[in-house]
């Protein structure tokens, strides 16, 4: 399996937080993904880029916060995340990068 350049557009970055680290013990990895990416696209991108077998993909959209900037109210962008469950025995080390 080879990675297609469009797969790099689907996966934006890994999420490295305390919650994401706790999920890694359950064989799950969290990524920030493109807002228009679908579950099948995310599954294919992870399988091709990291050469692992994906069991399932769950997605969520975190709404952007309202912030003040120079007295004006602004809105941060929404962020889409994907929680990717890997098959047994499969691992991804997200700290090394692509």
From Swiss-Prot:
<dbReference type="InterPro" id="IPR013025">
    <property type="entry name" value="Ribosomal_uL23-like"/>
</dbReference>
<dbReference type="GO" id="GO:1990904">
    <property type="term" value="C:ribonucleoprotein complex"/>
</dbReference>
<dbReference type="Pfam" id="PF00276">
    <property type="entry name" value="Ribosomal_L23"/>
</dbReference>
<keyword id="KW-0699">rRNA-binding</keyword>
<comment type="subunit">
    <text>Part of the 50S ribosomal subunit. Contacts protein L29, and trigger factor when it is bound to the ribosome.</text>
</comment>
<dbReference type="InterPro" id="IPR012677">
    <property type="entry name" value="Nucleotide-bd_a/b_plait_sf"/>
</dbReference>
<dbReference type="InterPro" id="IPR012678">
    <property type="entry name" value="Ribosomal_uL23/eL15/eS24_sf"/>
</dbReference>
<dbReference type="GO" id="GO:0019843">
    <property type="term" value="F:rRNA binding"/>
</dbReference>
<comment type="similarity">
    <text>Belongs to the universal ribosomal protein uL23 family.</text>
</comment>
<dbReference type="GO" id="GO:0005840">
    <property type="term" value="C:ribosome"/>
</dbReference>
<dbReference type="InterPro" id="IPR001014">
    <property type="entry name" value="Ribosomal_uL23_CS"/>
</dbReference>
<dbReference type="GO" id="GO:0003735">
    <property type="term" value="F:structural constituent of ribosome"/>
</dbReference>
<keyword id="KW-0694">RNA-binding</keyword>
<comment type="function">
    <text>One of the early assembly proteins it binds 23S rRNA. One of the proteins that surrounds the polypeptide exit tunnel on the outside of the ribosome. Forms the main docking site for trigger factor binding to the ribosome.</text>
</comment>
<dbReference type="GO" id="GO:0006412">
    <property type="term" value="P:translation"/>
</dbReference>
<protein>
    <recommendedName>
        <fullName>Large ribosomal subunit protein uL23</fullName>
    </recommendedName>
</protein>
<keyword id="KW-0689">Ribosomal protein</keyword>
<keyword id="KW-0687">Ribonucleoprotein</keyword>
